[in-house]
């Protein structure tokens, strides 16, 4: 009886899962958001504040907040943390000069109380560009293996083509099934 109830509950459970998409300016956050929501590339300009879209994957609803990444906006990221289940960090794989800034922002975020249970998905974006950092390099620069308090996954992607994005969503879906 309990198993039947659980299966029926899953059919009708329309719980929304809050996701924030962060990263430095020009990393590709907004492009990824609109690839998820419209499955196409849209012309974007720097995000001032945030964009929000609901994405439905296999009857699972994600409310995705794309938050501006300019230096002047990063201090306000924490206002979006409440009830966040997943953090997507978008890394510009061509931006070797600012990978250390990305690392600083990442660890600042992970230390925040409101994100202590959040899963972490890192999109290594712009993998289509020659001479970009590999997933292994980014993982090493960000010291991802030192993250013990959060489930995390790093995924190579290209926001312009959508390559790798579905695999990231699949990882998030797999984390929800475990809960």
From Swiss-Prot:
Gene Ontology molecular function: any one: GTP binding
Tissue expression: Low amounts were found in most tissues examined with highest levels in brain, intestine and thymus.
Keywords: GTP-binding, Lipoprotein, Myristate, Nucleotide-binding
CDD domains: Arl5_Arl8
GO process annotations (BP): intracellular protein transport; protein localization to Golgi membrane; vesicle-mediated transport
Pfam families in the record: Arf
Superkingdom of origin: Eukaryota
Residue positions binding GTP: 23-30, 66-70, 125-128, 159
Tagged with keyword Nucleotide-binding: yes
Example of a GO cellular component annotation carried by this entry: cytoplasm
Gene3D superfamilies associated with the record: P-loop containing nucleotide triphosphate hydrolases
Lipid-bearing positions (N-myristoyl glycine): 2
NCBIfam families associated with the record: small_GTP (TIGR00231)
Family: Belongs to the small GTPase superfamily. Arf family.
General function of this protein: Lacks ADP-ribosylation enhancing activity.
Protein known as: ADP-ribosylation factor-like protein 5A
Gene, per the UniProt record: Arl5a
């Amino acid at each position: 009886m309990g198993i039947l109830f659980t299966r029926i509950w899953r059919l009708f459970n329309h719980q929304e899962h809050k996701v924030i998409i962060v990263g430095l300016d020009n990393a590709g956050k907004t492009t990824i958001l609109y690839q998820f929501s419209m499955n196409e590339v849209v012309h974007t300009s720097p995000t001032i504040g945030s964009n929000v879209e609901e994405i439905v994957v296999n009857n699972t609803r994600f409310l995705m907040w794309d938050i501006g990444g300019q230096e002047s906006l990063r201090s306000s990221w924490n206002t979006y943390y409440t009830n966040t289940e997943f953090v997507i960090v978008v890394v510009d794989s061509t931006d070797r000069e600012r990978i250390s800034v990305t690392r600083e922002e990442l660890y600042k975020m992970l230390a925040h109380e409101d994100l202590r249970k959040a899963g972490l998905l890192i999109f290594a974006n712009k993998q289509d560009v020659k001479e970009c950092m590999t997933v292994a390099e980014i993982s090493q620069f960000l010291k991802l293996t030192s993250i013990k308090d959060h489930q995390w996954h790093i995924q190579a992607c290209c926001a312009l083509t959508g390559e790798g994005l579905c695999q990231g969503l699949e990882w998030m879906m797999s984390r929800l099934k475990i809960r």
